[in-house]
């Protein structure tokens, strides 16, 4: 199995499940940003070169946004974020130095609509 697909199915499953859990709170501050990013990552998972790096950026974004808006996740939501974090750890530290984790635009490209 290619390395690219190693964590693809788990990542798809975890992001879609987390989105379905969080979408009910979309009217609360911070939740809409997290849900937008979860949708964007779900779209990009099939075409990304490194699933692990994308998931790593996602988890960092979720953590910083949750901290900013003082979001407290349920036990099930937290378990999914931890599982995504384990996948993201496989990417290592490349590209994280001096990165802006709170920037939502890192998940969008110029060509996205």
Curated annotation (Swiss-Prot):
UniProt cross-references to Gene3D superfamilies, sorted A to Z: Ta0600-like
Pfam families associated with the record: EntA_Immun
Superkingdom, taxonomy of origin: Bacteria
Keywords: Bacteriocin immunity, Plasmid
Entries under InterPro entries matching the protein: LciA_Immunity-like, Ta0600-like_sf
GO BP term, example: bacteriocin immunity
Family that this chain belongs to: Belongs to the immunity protein EntA family.
Purpose: Imparts immunity to mesentericin-Y105 to naturally sensitive host strains.
Protein name: Probable mesentericin-Y105 immunity protein
Organism the protein comes from: Leuconostoc mesenteroides
């Amino acid at each position: 199995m290619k390395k690219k697909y190693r964590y693809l199915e788990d990542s798809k499953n975890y992001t879609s499940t987390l989105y379905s859990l969080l979408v009910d709170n979309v009217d609360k501050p911070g939740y809409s940003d997290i849900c937008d990013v979860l949708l964007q990552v779900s779209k990009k998972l099939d075409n990304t070169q490194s699933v692990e790096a994308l998931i790593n950026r996602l988890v960092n974004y979720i953590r910083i946004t949750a901290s900013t808006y003082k979001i407290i996740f349920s036990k099930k939501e937290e378990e999914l974020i931890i599982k995504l974090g384990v996948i993201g750890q496989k990417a290592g530290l490349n590209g994280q130095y001096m990165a802006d984790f709170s920037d939502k635009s890192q998940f969008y490209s110029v060509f996205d609509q």
